[in-house]
Amino acid sequence: MASSSVPPATVSAATTGPGPGFGFASKTKKKHFVQQEVKVFRAADPLVGVFLWGVAHSINELSQVPPPVMLLPDDFKASSKIKVNNHLFHRENLPSHFKFKEYCPQVFRNLRDRFGIDDQDYLVSLTRNPPSESEGSDGRFLICYDRTLVIKEVSSEDIADMHSNLSNYHQYIVKCHGNTLLPQFLGMYRVSVDNEDSYMLVMRNMFSHRLPVHRKYDLKGSLVSREASDKEKVKELPTLKGMDFLNKNQKVYIGEDEKKIFLEKLKRDVEFLVQLKIMDYSLLLGIHDIIRGSEPEEEGPVREDESEVDGDCSLTGPPALVGSYGTSPEGIGGYIHSHRPLGPGEFESFIDVHAIRSAEGAPQKEVYFMGLIDILTQYDAKKKAAHAAKTVKHGAGAEISTVHPEQYAKRFLDFITNIFA
């Protein structure tokens, strides 16, 4: 961790509102010089460093303003921006020039609240220690130090799709009181370093922050080309698919009440996705083996990023943030330390919101983590063309993934209903 005095920097801050298309027209813009003492995160990756700095700056800005009584249409078109130009800023801390943009800050603030996540906990979980790289199917995938949040690098098209559906998503979360299998979207950002834009989505981790997953499946319902590759299968924790699930005779052993609640929630969520003409989503299934998880593990080597960080390492924005982390300085997962110690296979349902324990008498003592992922693909001209091409290749009756949203939903629900014992 480094504490450095930041030399005078030109900082341009802007609050923006709606504009044509996906762009935004600036409503207000001010430029001023600041001299400030800032604790700066020593991130090896400039992109990550700027992202974490920007989140800290954003949360600090939001903390100065009370939440609105109700969200207005303009809140779904708004954004906040900051531009930093500082030729003297040391490269090992942050780049000398960068821009940071948060989309719809009040909307995501409201969503975090509805998902039971305090802004200060959100900040600490993201920034107290460096996030670690995790294996993702496409794009960059980071997981925060307490494993409660994931940061996914997405395309500008994904951001545009997310932006266009955000109002519907928010209304749905309000209607279901946050009780959903959909991804819990908590923040949407753009980071500009070296004249390159990167887009980040922050979500709650579908898996546990403390119970390791021993097997995982990405289930769509389609069986064509839905088997993990040989290259994937040799990984320590491969992402298996529908054919693998069937070939291994895998089943999910939960009680009838839990199964009923889960399927009702799933059907409601899928109906919502059909209304938005969304398809190609999956059920992510993670399985924690309680017996295996209770066995002592050999200590592995200390990760390089852990060995380089002391306990007080934090990235903060303006000085008001330094050392002011509210009443739960351990972040989202920190609540766990104020309660009784958890035994093998035990979890706190308000943190591990997607966890379901196997039923009494089940052949395997397991904890299952199940939620919907990849919900940004809409049925557009590209999907129609892909559907036509695959129909020619595999035949009209083949279980291909690119079908109409209604067909996709029916096939998906039929498949998921049958994964239970």
Curated annotation (Swiss-Prot):
It is an enzyme of class 2 (transferase). Phosphatidylinositol 5-phosphate 4-kinase with low enzymatic activity. May be a GTP sensor, has higher GTP-dependent kinase activity than ATP-dependent kinase activity. PIP4Ks negatively regulate insulin signaling through a catalytic-independent mechanism. They interact with PIP5Ks and suppress PIP5K-mediated PtdIns(4,5)P2 synthesis and insulin-dependent conversion to PtdIns(3,4,5)P3. The modification N-acetylalanine is found at A2. GO terms for cellular component: endoplasmic reticulum; plasma membrane. GO terms for molecular function: 1-phosphatidylinositol-4-phosphate 5-kinase activity; 1-phosphatidylinositol-5-phosphate 4-kinase activity; ATP binding. Pfam families: PIP5K (PF01504). The modification Phosphoserine is found at S26, S349. GO terms for biological process: 1-phosphatidyl-1D-myo-inositol 4,5-bisphosphate biosynthetic process; negative regulation of insulin receptor signaling pathway. Its main location: endoplasmic reticulum. Phosphorylated, phosphorylation is induced by EGF. It catalyses: a 1,2-diacyl-sn-glycero-3-phospho-(1D-myo-inositol-5-phosphate) + ATP = a 1,2-diacyl-sn-glycero-3-phospho-(1D-myo-inositol-4,5-bisphosphate) + ADP + H(+); 1,2-dihexadecanoyl-sn-glycero-3-phospho-(1D-myo-inositol-5-phosphate) + ATP = 1,2-dihexadecanoyl-sn-glycero-3-phospho-(1D-myo-inositol-4,5-bisphosphate) + ADP + H(+); 1,2-dihexadecanoyl-sn-glycero-3-phospho-(1D-myo-inositol-5-phosphate) + GTP = 1,2-dihexadecanoyl-sn-glycero-3-phospho-(1D-myo-inositol-4,5-bisphosphate) + GDP + H(+). InterPro entries: PInositol-4-P-4/5-kinase_C_sf (IPR027483), PInositol-4-P-4/5-kinase_core (IPR002498), PInositol-4-P-5-kinase_N (IPR027484), PInositol-4/5-P-5/4-kinase (IPR023610). This is Phosphatidylinositol 5-phosphate 4-kinase type-2 gamma. The gene is PIP4K2C. Interacts with PIP5K1A; the interaction inhibits PIP5K1A kinase activity. The keyword Protein biosynthesis does not apply. Keywords: Acetylation, ATP-binding, Cytoplasm, Endoplasmic reticulum, Kinase, Lipid metabolism, Nucleotide-binding, Phosphoprotein, Transferase. Disulfide bonds: none annotated. Residues 43-420 form the PIPK domain. It is found in: Endoplasmic reticulum; Cytoplasm.
